[in-house]
Structures are given as C-alpha cells and as structure tokens.
C-alpha cells in the first residue's frame, strides 16, 4: 500500500511540475536539410536573432526552441512530427512551416492539443481559415502578387502571360495577379501551370514567345527552381527581346542573387521584405541575423517571418503567464501592432494574418559588385486580398 501511495505521489508530482513548469517549449518545423535547407537556416537565424536581442526568458519562464526537419513538402511527416512535439516534447507552441501543405496538415491537431500555430512562411491565404489557433507573421502570395499587376500596367504592359508552379501558392499567385490586372484593364492571354518538379523551362519560354504577350508574370518557389527559370528567361532571348518579367519577391530572394547575377538585373518584384530595407530596426536585425546565419549572403526573407513570429510567441507567453491556453494566447495578439525590421506591421484581429507594407523592388548592382533588391515604391498597410476571394 505504501509503495502504491508513493507511486501515486510521484505521478502527481510529475503532473504538477509539468503544469507549473517554468520552461515553455516552442516546436519549429521546417526544412533544415535537403534542397530547401537554406530556408530552414533562415528560420533559425531569425529566431536566434530575436532571442539574442530579447533573451530567452519571458517573465519567470524560460523559452526553449525544439526543431524538427522536413526537407521537402511532406504533409504526413509534418503532422506526425507536430503530434510528437505536442505529446512527447510537451511544446506549447508550434511554428515555422515553410511549405503550405505541411501547415495545412497540422491545423487539425491544434484544438485537440491546445496549441497555437505561428506560420513563419507558408503563404496560401486559406491556412488561417483552417483553425482559430493559426496566426501568420509572414505574408501571403495574394498579398505580394496583387501590387505587381498595377506596376505592369504603369509600365505600359497591357497583355501578360502568367506562368506559375502548380501548387497552392502558385495558384494563389495566378489568381491574385489576374484579378488585379484584369480589373484595371489588362489582359492575361494565357495561364500556364507547371509541375513543381519542372526543371526544363525551354518549352515554357517558347510558349511565352508565341503568346504575343508584352510581359510575363511568374511565380515559383524560391531556391533551385527560380535559378533555372531565370536562366531560361535570359538564354531563350525573352529578356533581350523586351518581354518584361514581373513577379512577387520569391523570384529574387537575396540568397539567390549571387547565382542569378546579371540575369536578374532590372527585374521588378513586389514583396514584404528586402535585406536592404533602410531602417534602424532592420539594420539591428540584419546585424544579429547575419551573425546567426554565418554567411551574410545567405540571409533572406524567411528570417524576418521567424523573427516576428518569435515576437508574437513571446507576447502569447506573457499573456498566458507561461500556461498552456491556446485561445487566450491567440486572443492576446489580435490587433497587436509593432515596428518590425520590414516596417510597421499588425495582426488583423479578424483574420489573424499580418498587415504590412509591400515594396516594389528592382534588382540593382551595388558599388562593390553585389546584387540587391532596391526598394523604389511602397504600398502601405496591405492586408490579404486572398481571404476576400475565398
């Protein structure tokens, strides 16, 4: 009987210590190996930069980040890892998610696990509609693809062909650009959706030339595919023939610019963040994030989504006193406003999506020979038009 009583006491003690633990774990799922490892590296750089600046404590609670690797889009693996993080690791927050399908797969477990999800990259608009416990600190493809339609028209381009990768964000990009472009009087002469695995773009380039379009709107996921597409755009004579290229900023992320080189010069994109953004907050962030990532040339946009994601999570921890309460945590950040390295931002209280400036950028060459995204126009306080289109 005494042994049973002691065992029961031990179990109760463990449960009590878990309930009042002063360590709050954040589980981050992202690509930390494989072809998209640089994006996961940027997640970690942004998180490390935030914690270097703000410390690892919120009140009396110590914040611990636990990472899990999903090298490529894999919804089943992402869901399994999220369940493992919640059940075995005891994380109170899930974050990261570079790929939309991975984020979508995890949303069903949020309510059951009583954990919020902070999306640091995945850009399909509808993610936030899948659970009231989702908050996004990155961007959506609708948000970054809509303003570039106005830019194309201002450049005198009336006929455009759309070329996107055939998955959630690509379809969002196609729809966003078409809606804004046609509403303003432009014509999308053809819409091409390419398999994600496409690596030979020559046939696509021929279709673009044959279409009679004055410009091409393109969306591909950052990293290997963008390099091949941009090279084909130049090698097949589209750039030299005056067919202008317009895109959201995924196409010219900073870590790709050394490889893109002269091919990218003059390309116009609209995006929520450039490493070159001129503000005190960004200069401070870039200094810390470059230390964290090791190679300054590798710093890119997922880092700022992760940095701001940690800012939101710290606010959630503060609001809940370190206790596990997803509803209270999310409620605490609705309407939250702050000055991010990217500029002024806020969390929309209805959609739980980030409202932010979108910048028109042109790829330029600095005096030292490096390439960068030069901001030349600001579209202020952009919400997510994609949610209205659902």
UniProtKB/Swiss-Prot annotation:
Database matches in InterPro entries: BCAA_transport, Leu-bd, Leu_Ile_Val-bd, Peripla_BP_I
Keyword set, alphabetical order: Amino-acid transport, Signal, Transport
Extent of the signal sequence: 1-21
Biological process terms in GO annotation: amino acid transport
Protein name per the record: Leu/Ile/Val-binding protein homolog 6
Lineage: Bacteria, Pseudomonadati, Pseudomonadota, Alphaproteobacteria, Hyphomicrobiales
PANTHER family hit by this protein: LEUCINE-SPECIFIC-BINDING PROTEIN, PERIPLASMIC BINDING PROTEIN OF ABC TRANSPORTER FOR NATURAL AMINO ACIDS
Role, per record: Component of an amino-acid transport system.
Record family assignment: Belongs to the leucine-binding protein family.
UniProt KW Transport keyword: yes
